[in-house]
Regions:
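One-carbon transfer enzymes
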Residues: 1-185
Length: 185
């Protein structure tokens, strides 16, 4: 059985979708959720889903505590779901091509440090782009520059707001991310 860890900094909607998707699968277990924020909504979701959840501060991430936890739980694959910290080199070296992320734009557009959530959707609308979407990609040492696994597009509508665009992009995330993860295992 493959053991997955989900890393999330926010409310955890993608973490919940992924956990529910794999709940009935016999070959995959969501073993652990890690967050870097003590008040992240993902903590409550993890409790409801009966998945252990640990808070690891940014400082502790940099000092190797997250890697220790991942090894203790014998994690095979790492899924980032709205995780806002850069993954430290020690984790990258121990999990080559076994860490994936989802980004709410068609990378390389609107990627990099500080480009997450509403910031991305506001930038797409400000630029007047005709389409947006999601990018699922491997993680490397740079923000949002790892090898692309899948991109899925959606239209940007004339009356879109950051919220309406985000809603369509989230639906793409929920639909495609768990399936792509399963295909990579």
């Amino acid at each position: 059985m493959k053991k997955l860890a989900i890393l999330a900094s926010g409310t955890g909607t993608n973490a919940e979708r992924i956990t529910r998707y794999f709940a009935e699968k016999k070959t995959v277990e969501i073993t652990l959720i890690i967050t870097n924020k003590e008040n992240a909504g993902v903590i409550e979701r993890a409790e409801r889903l009966n998945v252990p959840c640990m808070v690891v501060s940014s400082k502790d991430f940099k000092e190797g505590k997250a890697l220790e936890i991942l090894k203790r739980y014998e994690i095979d694959f790492i899924v980032l779901a709205g995780f806002l910290l850069r993954i430290p080199d020690d984790i990258l070296h121990n999990y080559p091509n076994r860490i994936v992320n989802i980004h709410p734009s068609l990378l390389p557009k609107y990627g990099g440090k500080g480009m997450f959530g509403h910031h991305v959707h506001e930038a797409v609308l400000a630029a007047g782009d005709a389409e947006s979407g999601i990018t699922i990609h491997y993680i490397d040492e740079h923000y949002d520059e790892g090898a692309v696994i899948l991109q899925v597009k959606c239209p940007v509508l004339p009356d879109d707001t950051p919220e309406t665009l985000a809603s369509r992009v989230h639906q793409l995330e929920y639909e495609h991310y768990p399936v792509v993860i399963e295909g990579l295992l």
